[in-house]
Amino acid sequence: MKGIFIAFDQAHKDAVISALDKLNCRGFSFIEQLQGRGSKTGDPHYGTHAWASMNSGIITMVEDNIVDKLLEALKNIDENAEMLGLRAFVWNIEQCY
């Protein structure tokens, strides 16, 4: 099992949730307002007067065979609007109940 943390511009919310739905990734936790900036490109997302946009985040746990498909779907969303920003990070999950 893998944990995937997805940070994205709020404009991507519907597309990200749709990608999860299409792969039957039902369970996730959603963080509506998440501040940050990309490590390489893109504008900061601080929700301030100067940097008005905001990020959101989703963390989900998926079976190993879903990871590559989900990452591909997320990459496609990002590439269609690169300046908005979207990144996904995968962690090994040792145990859960």
Predicted feature residues:
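Positively charged, small/polar-rich N-terminal and surface patches that mediate targeting and assembly
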Residues: 1-97
